[in-house]
């Protein structure tokens, strides 16, 4: 007979597999983009839509995931998430055109948007509150392994098999996870308040149209008139949501959140900072392969120091913030990240290849320091009644800003390279240098926002990871 403790451990393993699938897929695709472009007959400098479609879908669908889990039950929502993600992976591998791949990535994104938040919710429901921290540490460990092996595994599969396998490897894991969910996962439900479907649709339209407008000319080849129409539609949709949410206690996100100055400052700073940081995972593998002529596997291996730096920094973030305070940490980490990011193409083009892993290591450290500090600053002063809404809005804003960052990186590369691809040439080096210079400026600008954070010397025992 299976004991309750054993059953809970198996359930935690199911959630952990979901975390692993999500983080692996997030990092494995970037390294493969040039090879996917070659296979589909596309320009590798115009492949940002493959990333944007996925991240934007996650941003749009996140607000609905928690409500669905409470209404339908965590078991069936988590099962559906794994099925959608796995089927989306199969469709990605079967894609013969860029548009087919983009649509398949949207399907993956829907599954991802439900998988991780519902996984966290599942842990909250199946373990006692005093064991929650230990349980989350257990289920997120595979999620930390995913980014570590993702870039190198993606490069290896592309180089020694084909790009299709970066999606096909999700199939056996997905099938096992889905069966285990059916057999072992309890179906916890909770009473729910009315879901703000009108607000959800307005926000979804606003985010989607504005992001598509940003990527419209470079990635989608839209006309100026179509782009203007998308911008107008997005502005109207977001303005309509603001009007809809005024005095509406059932609004998807309460406007009372913005009466909290620290939350508003943290949210704006977090969004602007993640636009710059979102450019890095997209830009770096393309620079290594197109700019320097690295093989996909070599480019994937070069990304590992960045992940190690990020994981290492997470162990000392609390001490750093307690010592220097939020404002000094955020301002200095932001400016240092801009300098370190710009130094990568300079070091590489000058032939100092041995320094590149060091640069990427510090890039990962500074990124992790900013992310965790921003998350905690944004949420730390919210009252309990607004904590859930504020956290959901922050999660959505994080994904949205990352999609904007990838779109911006694609625009910069397309502009400076004039959409012409020639591997490891002076013209290509110049295009990447100009792109990195603009990216460094974008990364540095949020320091102006973070400089407005009030001086803070309070202890922070639990920083958001």
From Swiss-Prot:
The keyword Electron transport does not apply. It is found in: Cell inner membrane. It is a multi-pass membrane protein. One of its GO terms (cellular component) is plasma membrane. The keyword Endoplasmic reticulum does not apply. InterPro entries: MFS (IPR011701), MFS_dom (IPR020846), MFS_trans_sf (IPR036259), Multi-R_MdtD (IPR023721). Belongs to the major facilitator superfamily. TCR/Tet family. This is Putative multidrug resistance protein MdtD. It comes from Yersinia pseudotuberculosis serotype I (strain IP32953). The lineage of its organism: Bacteria, Pseudomonadati, Pseudomonadota, Gammaproteobacteria, Enterobacterales. The gene is mdtD.
